[in-house]
Amino acid sequence: MAFEDVAVYFSQEEWGLLDTAQRALYRRVMLDNFALVASLGLSTSRPRVVIQLERGEEPWVPSGTDTTLSRTTYRRRNPGSWSLTEDRDVSGEWPRAFPDTPPGMTTSVFPVAGACHSVKSLQRQRGASPSRERKPTGVSVIYWERLLLGSGSGQASVSLRLTSPLRPPEGVRLREKTLTEHALLGRQPRTPERQKPCAQEVPGRTFGSAQDLEAAGGRGHHRMGAVWQEPHRLLGGQEPSTWDELGEALHAGEKSFECRACSKVFVKSSDLLKHLRTHTGERPYECAQCGKAFSQTSHLTQHQRIHSGETPYACPVCGKAFRHSSSLVRHQRIHTAEKSFRCSECGKAFSHGSNLSQHRKIHAGGRPYACAQCGRRFCRNSHLIQHERTHTGEKPFVCALCGAAFSQGSSLFKHQRVHTGEKPFACPQCGRAFSHSSNLTQHQLLHTGERPFRCVDCGKAFAKGAVLLSHRRIHTGEKPFVCTQCGRAFRERPALFHHQRIHTGEKTVRRSRASLHPQARSVAGASSEGAPAKETEPTPASGPAAVSQPAEV
């Protein structure tokens, strides 16, 4: 066996049809095959294609070059089929070997170590005359293989079959796949007359494996199965009889690819191959900057935006940009106030499905995260971490402009709108804009007159939940705001701030009722028109006791 027996060559057009994974697989297999042949002493010179591959050059050959694809002779077994037997190079004898096949068709297979290698056995439709057997040109079979088999996934255990520049004839399709492909796709290959999966056509005998074939005097690199066949069944699902019907079946969402590990079903075999990596743990796509690996190229593309800082998805309303389109969709719900995820038990609505899932744990009693200091329980570990900062006083999120610190990143994000002046939440009725969505929600209650927050003790209703919370302290007697210097407690935070001025000595000016209410001030001014206004000056404070104190609410 010489290196040319397993070598594959491409024209520039054919090389351009391969994706990155296929090219890498081709380089690796070709170099491994040459190393194997050289180790056996069967190769004395370094072929040009090997030199090109070692230099990192593109190994395609000019169109029209008579290249040896494989030392194979094609012989007719019966009037209805063609088969392969290894003998010699027939690349120049193709028109004579296949008189009913258009010139220019090249068929090649390069094997992958450890796999039951695929066959390129050309079979005509039984009973069809050469004139009726049309093989339209213009589209590479690579396209159809990617459509049906999901080739190009980078799986090293799948044999890569290349046929160009022809596409499958009308009513004829690629029916059988390699044993490895069937194992990956979760099904056993269906062969005519129920022959064994790895059967090799040998006159008078059928072998169940490559080892049996080699023991019988055959060669270990024989190929199996048939490629051009009459329409049959694909992976257990009823297969359409034409390519048009096949396309309709794909668009109709017919699921026929099942994972043998978890029984999940897919419409496309390429989706199944991607899914199988979740079971095998394979991550063939590696980031060149940080070395992190991914199972899909799309995940690698998204990850690389972290290094480049690229944010291609911009919000048309506020201009904020995101790395992922899904993040933009979630963000746009802020502007539309859309809350399409509603709890079936309490009716509470959420803008994100993940928030609804966490909320449902409340009804199910699922609050697994408990605070070690106060015992309060939470649905999420992140909520517990945020809560613990109320005990420790930690504020790790600092504003770079003014130095204000916050315990939560979302609070810092909202605070930064004070500096930017951004008000992305606009009222659709009056056009007034707000910096926070909660402010917009409260504002819209003015238009509707709704007071959704009702006290269970006295029945009084409020437009704001915070006002209801403060009101509830009247019934409970709770005073959570405690002065750190004297220990006096208050129901509301503003009352505590007023009280703390006693200790700091800060002077306050008592404001009249007219100063608090502009309408009352205007009425007072009208009634005293023409009379000298009586000026009231604040009485100098003789001590802390003279400072006015607000009454407790």
Swiss-Prot record:
Annotated TM spans: none
Tissue expression as described in the entry: Expressed at high levels in the spleen, thymus, and PBMC, at low levels in the prostate, ovary, small intestine, colon (mucosal lining), placenta, lung, and pancreas, and very weakly expressed in the liver and kidney.
Motif range (Nuclear localization signal): 130-135
KRAB domain mapped to chain residues: 1-72
SUPFAM superfamilies: beta-beta-alpha zinc fingers, KRAB domain (Kruppel-associated box)
Subcellular location: Nucleus
Domain of life: Eukaryota
Keywords: DNA-binding, Metal-binding, Nucleus, Repeat, Transcription, Transcription regulation, Zinc, Zinc-finger
GO annotations of cellular component type: nucleus
Zinc finger (C2H2-type): 257-279, 285-307, 313-335, 341-363, 369-391, 397-419, 425-447, 453-475, 481-503
Metal-binding as UniProt keyword: yes
PANTHER family reported for this sequence: C2H2-TYPE DOMAIN-CONTAINING PROTEIN, ZINC FINGER AND BTB DOMAIN-CONTAINING
Stated family: Belongs to the krueppel C2H2-type zinc-finger protein family.
Purpose of the protein: May be involved in transcriptional regulation. May be involved in regulation of cell proliferation.
The protein, known as: Zinc finger protein 324A
Lineage of producing organism: Eukaryota, Metazoa, Chordata, Craniata, Vertebrata
